[in-house]
């Protein structure tokens, strides 16, 4: 929660407030970590849980011993947040579930589900200069919303996968709730291995992932003729800079049409005829419809993608150079996906 903002010590103060609010919870969880062998706690302030899964917790392939035999099996994940699906960018099948289901899974109970339809999403080409993973994912959201993928799995394949970084794949997988699918899965390939090395996984784990995936037919192979329930395709060269809104992520708006679309939405939604009086730092301000009151770079989708974060930093740098200033009533916040990002 952002209580303090626009000051050099805002981060440390907000972290301290979190400890003050949740000290009892943190103490209980710390006890749990020492009491149970299969229970780990990631310290507060480390990052957004989905990014921590990518960087630290997920193994892609696990191994364990039972009855004197060593078994290897695919990594899976269920979480209580809808954007748990982000881990599918790392070839780990996972999605969000309800609290009771998650608790049952923690206690060793299975989660039941119907075998889903699988929609193949073919990706070809390469993103043009000036377009980002955010532009791509908004395009995919719009396409899959029109297609109708509620309750279905989406698996991405095609020659264009080699042109998508793991961070870009994670961005796409993260938005599965927005395009309506249970998950958006990326198969294991060289980019997966590259990320595991980059994030400091040990050599034995990486070797196991590569060998197991290839032996079990889980390794991405463009020559394989996979049978999907249905397919859809996208040429990355056709993706252009976009935003979405004003309310739904599938309402994609080309950046070139942003001003016109804002004017249209403003006229349709404006209801306040008299400005609202607000007091900030003991000063009175009048705020009217259309004024920005929150400037936040905090979503688990964008703040976990280094290239998008760099883009935000460059825009901020240019804004400072041009002498632009934030209005006193605007609450600003930045929450990177992790300390690594």
How does the language model describe each region?
Residues 1-341:
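Fe-S-dependent hydro-lyases/dehydratases of central metabolism
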């Amino acid at each position: 929660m952002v209580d303090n903002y626009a000051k050099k010590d805002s981060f440390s103060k907000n972290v301290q407030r979190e400890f003050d609010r949740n000290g009892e919870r943190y103490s209980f969880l710390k006890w749990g970590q020492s009491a149970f062998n299969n229970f780990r706690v990631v310290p507060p302030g480390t990052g957004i849980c989905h990014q921590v899964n990518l960087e630290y917790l997920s193994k892609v392939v696990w191994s364990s011993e039972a009855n004197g035999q060593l078994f290897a099996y695919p990594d899976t994940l269920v979480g209580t947040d809808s954007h748990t699906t982000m881990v599918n960018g790392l070839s780990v099948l996972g999605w969000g579930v309800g609290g009771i289901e998650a608790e049952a899974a923690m206690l060793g109970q299975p989660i039941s589900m119907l075998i889903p339809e699988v929609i193949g999403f073919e990706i070809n080409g390469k993103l043009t200069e000036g377009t980002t993973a955010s532009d791509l994912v908004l395009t995919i959201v719009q396409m899959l919303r029109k297609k109708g993928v509620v309750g279905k799995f989406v698996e991405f394949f095609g020659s264009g996968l080699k042109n998508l970084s793991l961070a870009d794949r994670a961005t796409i997988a993260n938005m599965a709730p927005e395009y309506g699918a249970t998950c958006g899965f990326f198969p294991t390939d060289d980019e997966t291995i590259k990320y595991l090395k980059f994030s400091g996984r040990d050599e034995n784990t990486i070797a196991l992932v590569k060998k197991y995936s290839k032996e079990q037919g889980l390794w991405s192979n463009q020559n394989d003729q996979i049978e999907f329930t249905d397919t859809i395709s996208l040429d990355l060269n056709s993706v252009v800079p976009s935003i979405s809104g004003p309310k739904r992520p599938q309402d994609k708006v080309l950046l070139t049409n942003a001003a016109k679309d804002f004017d249209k939405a403003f006229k349709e939604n404006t209801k306040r005829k008299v400005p609202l009086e607000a007091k900030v730092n003991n000063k009175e301000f009048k705020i009217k419809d259309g004024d920005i009151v929150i400037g936040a770079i905090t979503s688990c989708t964008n703040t976990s993608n280094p290239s998008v974060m760099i883009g935000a930093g460059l825009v901020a740098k240019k804004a400072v150079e041009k002498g632009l200033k934030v209005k006193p009533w605007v609450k600003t916040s930045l929450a990177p996906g992790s300390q690594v990002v």
